[in-house]
Amino acid sequence: MSAIAPGMILIAYLCGSISSAILVCRLCGLPDPRTSGSGNPGATNVLRIGGKGAAVAVLIFDVLKGMLPVWGAYELGVSPFWLGLIAIAACLGHIWPVFFGFKGGKGVATAFGAIAPISWDLTGVMAGTWLLTVLLSGYSSLGAIVSALIAPFYVWWFKPQFTFPVSMLSCLILLRHHDNIQRLWRRQETKIWTKFKRKREKDPE
């Protein structure tokens, strides 16, 4: 079945290239996430500029566009090596989307979706790591960074045959969070709920 893998890689990249953040913002009459807020077309920035409903829609779509190509390839019997490349292709599409001038998001939700078909136990542990980090720190970016750093070890424990491609995904996500890492180091990063606190202060009941 590996003969179909190159085609699945292309499909995964094209799926990843559909920027849900940009499309949802257009449909909802919101500012372009590439030029508003943090400038990142992802769920966290849509949360800042458009609220919870739009952000949830973006998050679900971004997870699915990573999950569906990998899941489809898995069901077709594609080998772990090619599954890893398909997962990476979906994330590359999200980060550098051909349909939107190669300016995309950071790939966290899409990577999470791409890893999900590998193991639901792994998915739960990864989600718990991200959520716990965000709840303790308030930083969505830190949750992504910590999850990316720990992911290869989780995968090695649950599904060791996928350790290499997941490590590549982790490196890709960490590279995309270079600016966030610098802001966290300088204590200049914005917490995920800061926008809502400011709004309540401006519009008290």
UniProtKB/Swiss-Prot annotation:
Xref: NCBIfam families: glycerol-3-phosphate 1-O-acyltransferase PlsY (TIGR00023)
Similarity comment: Belongs to the PlsY family.
Pfam families: G3P_acyltransf
InterPro entries: G3P_acylTferase_PlsY
Cysteine disulfide partners in this protein: none
GO molecular function: acyl-phosphate glycerol-3-phosphate acyltransferase activity; glycerol-3-phosphate O-acyltransferase activity
Superkingdom field: Bacteria
Parts of the chain on the Periplasmic side: 1-3, 74-80, 133-137
Primary gene name: plsY
Transmembrane residue ranges: 4-24, 53-73, 81-101, 112-132, 138-158
GO cellular-component term (any): plasma membrane
Protein name as it appears in the record: Glycerol-3-phosphate acyltransferase
Reactions this protein catalyses: sn-glycerol 3-phosphate + an acyl-CoA = a 1-acyl-sn-glycero-3-phosphate + CoA; a fatty acyl-[ACP] + sn-glycerol 3-phosphate = a 1-acyl-sn-glycero-3-phosphate + holo-[ACP]
Predominant location category: membrane
Subunit structure: Probably interacts with PlsX.
EC number: 2.3.1.15, 2.3.1.n5
Root EC class: transferase
Cytoplasmic side: 25-52, 102-111, 159-205
